[in-house]
């Protein structure tokens, strides 16, 4: 049964409030209409395209990070629940890859995962004490890396965080990070 335009637009707004990362293609399949119809519906409802929705979510999350200044975060944090989970997005550009092969330099994938692990800890003073990482496939220029971090345990001044990075649902990087955080009774280093 076909949904009327006004009802579809209302449902579209509700759906994107719950999941702002849905593509026009996914929305088209969800509602059983053309991509052009979805784009017209978005325009009529003043709903920005995916890239702008991602930037908006990232902007709203920037003040939640305690240990890093916004410019110190590698990738765009799009979801953050301190001490629970976090998600960031990193678009691989020509400046991130080896010139001859077009393959992303590993330290960029590590930086995305590491800054996500630091951001997840609810403390002003957080350092990576140990990291065990694995690259599972090369990432190429133009690909979007979505890193998901979750807290796996906490104790004795250390927090264990697991990070998995994907490109189009395919795992490209995994890491287990032991994060050190200074407790309130320790003296802070002088700046």
UniProtKB/Swiss-Prot annotation:
One of the record's GO molecular function terms: DNA binding
Span of domain MaoC-like: 102-169
SUPFAM superfamilies, sorted: Thioesterase/thiol ester dehydrase-isomerase (SSF54637)
Entry-linked InterPro entries: HotDog_dom_sf (IPR029069), Thioestr_dom (IPR006683), Transcription_factor_FapR (IPR017275), WH-like_DNA-bd_sf (IPR036388)
UniProt keyword Ion transport present: no
Record's keyword terms, sorted: DNA-binding, Fatty acid biosynthesis, Fatty acid metabolism, Lipid biosynthesis, Lipid metabolism, Repressor, Transcription, Transcription regulation
GO BP field: fatty acid biosynthetic process; negative regulation of DNA-templated transcription; negative regulation of fatty acid biosynthetic process
Lineage: superkingdom: Bacteria
Functional note: Transcriptional factor involved in regulation of membrane lipid biosynthesis by repressing genes involved in fatty acid and phospholipid metabolism.
Family affiliation: Belongs to the FapR family.
Designated name of the protein: Transcription factor FapR
Protein's gene: fapR
